[in-house]
């Protein structure tokens, strides 16, 4: 077998019959599979051991040779080689065909490659292949031209003879008629009889004339056909062809079926055809030129590669190894077999029958029919259903052909190559483990024992508890006590991976240190639930075990949950206290707010003293008291120290200080690092998020992880101590509700009366009622808010951000308000009741639609979102950080601050997702002084400093302007949002971008919303809008943009409306037909700029690219995608969207080819285009010109240079057909291609720069070695870990944290 690590490219091409024979280990001659009595393969059949190898290891068919000592011997009795049975997965056979057949992919694919090469229409090609027309394969032009006069004379003579014969026959008949008439007259016959005789004779003479004319016409037709006969002419009239062959058979040759194409392909002159096509392209126009371009692509594909066109017609068919199309016995003696075996049997049966007919010398019509059936059998084998009705098996199910084996989710690519089932894995239900540390998980003992079995057995032998592995295995199976002691030892510091499906982003798989627990459920740390999107209502998780030392190191350093605190989408913490923890910490940090609570206004010398008072029940947690804090505690931000009294020293930072706060807040601050500023406010979810974000920005991971664990423990503790419960009595309906509703009911009646009197229209009534009841609902909500006491448990939950929101509370305690109907229109009758009061039957009924629609939408969204993620991953999978700096000086100008109405500079709203975590492209200079140098990371601190210095705009590096040939560079990408440091070389940023965009996809709403009102246009929003943008589709109701600077004129007729732009430079006017309902953004006579939007709606990205250029379309797409995500409150960094858009704009359409080896209209990679142009310019030629092409993500994925990646994505057969014709070579740059062939992916630690490291001493060490006198003089200190950089392990040191 081939070792995957020893090749760098994989090429696909067309196999000729000789290639197929060299792969084969023998010819399959019989359709038999296995003998039903002996269950052994039949000789020369589809499972023959002689061809494919033995069914049992080291054993021949007849049993003469058994055991491994006969390895390699070929049995002289049965002819089977003694070897391993697994060769039956590799060895191929072949079927020698009695007549050639065409490969259906090349004839029936769109476009038909055979048709393009031979310049034949697909339907004509089909006529030839399926024996409905003859094709002329050879004409002896020279001889025909030479003999034409003599042949013409011969034909003329024949024509003359026919005419003479006709004339003499007519004359004879006329004479006979005369004599007959004379006899009749003599006999005195009546006139009637004479007339009949005359008519009969005339009829006969007419037949003679017609027959002669037909013969002459046929002769003329045959002659004219022969005169103009040329190669590749088709003749569907069999009689005409036969006559042609009988008369002039020595001058031409023709036949039917694949044999005709084979002959034609053998004599086809590719060079001459290419030259002819280039001439047409140079001189031709329109349709002719387009077709010539398409044909030239196919012709030049054969010219530039080692492919032979005759490879598209097969003389023999390969038979794949039998273990890939197995036959298994079922209970009851029946057999289940792969569909391929049935398809192969059809081919063999028909082939054998054709051979027999040919041997018998059967008539041509019978032979042709059999050949056609053979062609159809091979078509079905290669791609069943591509032409005509598919071959079906039992129950009318179409059989799965070779093409179907590759296609789709169940095909070879996606089922077996990109996703495999793995061993050393387990699965169980998850429960919460509140006692765990952040980097730990609880693993059931039984599961751990099974997973770590080999490790435990080895350790048992090492410790002499067992003599050998066999007895160790027995000990483990019997569950001896010592086994569990050894298990504890084995799992120490051996991380395991936990995964929850669906794995929507990289945080769906994280590493943990296992802790053995009783029971059968896996225990999960509560803080990682957000990342996994897990809850404990029956969710299951899978456990995987990293085996090798490298795998364990990667799991510990890169995947340990405490190293994955930040979310890769926006660089903000994802490991956040939620729900109970938030409620507990909120309870802990609220103050009394004027309520009379125990112990208020007292003073304490320390937190410990105050805690004693609390334990003695003399002090409330929320009471405002004075507490003195020890040395080293940081006061709150913005705290002003009290004025020192005489004789007392001034306050210095780090001194002890006194603060008016609550005991709860003092306890909360003990959870945070000592040098963190004192938090003196109520901490809800939002505040907690800011604190954790601040911690992640400023402290090492170890401290952050420890602090998070402290917050978790305290949160649960105080949530329990708070005694927060929910009862129906906590839902307080505001007393003012009745009066509010009554007032609005009166307004409602007034509107109804106006409508009844005809003062307002139906639409106006609906609009007014909706406005009235929306106002009413809001007023009830305000009354309810005012009505809730701060200590109400439900209000506390919402106020802290632990669970629920005001809208849900309004529905429970206030009123439900307006709901929509099935058409998505708001029903103007509100639901006046709340859930606490209970709904009437009608109210309940009209509210059901919304609830059901919500569920249906969620189901649809999940599938659509998953498909979007798959396409995004596919388009961006080869974007990897390849180098540190590409050296570009280009970048994006981005706003970081805007001046408010008060003239104060404030950070822009989107600074988090646009500027944060990027690199500066140039120095930031204020008043001639550099305040931030280029290539510095823009973190929160630096952005605040720049805004403080009055900077409004900065130029940053971006992947859109990166000049790396493949992938992108670290400086243009900036900070890795998942680690908070500059991105490492080898990081697969493309996949992270795809996950970051795809993961929140399920949260985006589905459907188009009906805006209602005057315009009534449907606007696409949510997930469909994101798909529309990434697929670069023309949006529905597209808004036109001005192509030139000028003025607008509006032309309106009864049916149409047009916007006409008159350019200032006097060039031609541009007219934009628009809908009568479209809302205009410009008025009559208004000036417009280039690229200005003229109506309300979405613009077409292709127009933006054409008119405003590449940069504008990039900005437009990023902005539009962000709009959708922002509307749902999802935060994604711009750089992720930019990576996808960079991939969409990776290709150039060639306009003029110049001297470059590129065809006009061809789509090429930008890097290939630039390289080719550089080559042409250095050789003094004319470079090619092209324009950037915006491609949708599906199209861009399929157009990738890697055929393996494209084939495993979509349209597998089309991609493989194209790749084979072009003999494409896959240089294995992306991730997918390497996963498919089983190589390490070229990302992360799989990059060659990390794998091919040679450890060498430094120059200083060598010098020290040479000058060393004795052993003690040698200084080994500079050696480090070889020449690579050492990993700062203190970052991952959990020594003190584990205790």
Curated annotation (Swiss-Prot):
Keyword Magnesium: yes
GO molecular function: DNA binding; DNA-directed RNA polymerase activity; magnesium ion binding; zinc ion binding
Any one of the GO BP annotations: DNA-templated transcription
Any GO CC annotation of this UniProt entry: DNA-directed RNA polymerase complex
Record key words, sorted: DNA-directed RNA polymerase, Magnesium, Metal-binding, Nucleotidyltransferase, Transcription, Transferase, Zinc
Region (Disordered): 385-405
Note describing how the cofactor binds: Binds 1 Mg(2+) ion per subunit.
Membrane-traversing stretches: none
Cofactor(s) needed for function: Mg(2+); Zn(2+)
Annotated PANTHER family: DNA-DIRECTED RNA POLYMERASE, DNA-DIRECTED RNA POLYMERASE SUBUNIT BETA
Name of protein: DNA-directed RNA polymerase subunit beta'
InterPro entries on file: DNA-dir_RpoC_beta_prime, DNA-dir_RpoC_beta_prime_bact, RNA_pol_asu, RNA_pol_N, RNA_pol_Rpb1_1, RNA_pol_Rpb1_3, RNA_pol_Rpb1_3_sf, RNA_pol_Rpb1_4
Binding-site residues, Zn(2+) 2: 886, 962, 969, 972
Domain of life where this protein originates: Bacteria
Role noted for this protein: DNA-dependent RNA polymerase catalyzes the transcription of DNA into RNA using the four ribonucleoside triphosphates as substrates.
Binding locations of Mg(2+): 535, 537, 539
Assembly and oligomerization: The RNAP catalytic core consists of 2 alpha, 1 beta, 1 beta' and 1 omega subunit. When a sigma factor is associated with the core the holoenzyme is formed, which can initiate transcription.
Catalyzed chemical reaction(s): RNA(n) + a ribonucleoside 5'-triphosphate = RNA(n+1) + diphosphate
Species of the source: Streptomyces griseus subsp. griseus (strain JCM 4626 / CBS 651.72 / NBRC 13350 / KCC S-0626 / ISP 5235)
Keyword Membrane: no
Entry EC number(s): 2.7.7.6
Family that this chain belongs to: Belongs to the RNA polymerase beta' chain family.
CDD domains (alphabetical): RNAP_beta'_C (cd02655), RNAP_beta'_N (cd01609)
Pfam families for this protein: RNA_pol_Rpb1_1 (PF04997), RNA_pol_Rpb1_2 (PF00623), RNA_pol_Rpb1_3 (PF04983), RNA_pol_Rpb1_4 (PF05000), RNA_pol_Rpb1_5 (PF04998)
